Amino acid sequence: IQTPAAKYEQNGFWSDHWVYILDMVDTYLMVYPEKESHLLWDSAKVPFFMSPAYIKPRSERYVLVPNPDRSGTSTLRVLNAVVSETDTEYSLERYNEMKEIMNSSSYFADHTGAGSIWQRSAKDKDVFKVTIIAKLLMLGTLKFATLDPQGMGIEMEGGKPGWNDALNGLPGLLGSGMPETYECLRLIRYLRSSLEAYAVPHGSNKDSRPVVVPVEFHEFLDTIKGALTVYYSSDQKYDADIEYWTAASNAREQYREAILITFSGD
């Protein structure tokens, strides 16, 4: 029996590690193309890794530093983007929740040192899980909402670039990556085709399947939809770009705060 395992290794999150998830779906469907609906809706549900580190809000990771090119002035940088459990500002509630999980009878650590610190539901204290289609929808939406102010690259907000160590300084310069944007587009196109095939709205398909998501994500999705509505009704110039980016970033931070300890279970 395969058991999911995950492990946090270093001081940040590489901005492209999520792109392999759709590759696994594609590989499975190469062998079992007739099982797509089953894979997305009916296969074993998947949990959420509770990493010992989490991303700081912009108010804590955006800092002004002396501008080396112009004496007496400052420039914006991103420093110490994540909080680790050894840091003094680490959430005590999150720390206690992780220790409680590790001390529970259901905790499992494999020989590689990876553990099953999976986020729990506040409702029943059980591991919170969703279908694969829901997990992909959440991933695609969150990455779309992480586009930079120009709507071009996916921000390197986790303090790391993609798998290219030559770019290690770019996250500190508010960097973003276009390769991740193309991967996000690939994921969104797959979601669109899957939802059109199996989750047709308004009951036009008698076999249509609902996508059940956590209430916290549903609220986040509604906020992003509202921000996009405002943006598309504007002149779509620089000020509108910044207003949308601010709204999307605020929504992302509020979502993270809402699930910092547990999902509500609703």
Model-identified regions with their sequence ranges:
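Acidic, mature catalytic/reactive cores of soluble proteins
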Residues: 1-266
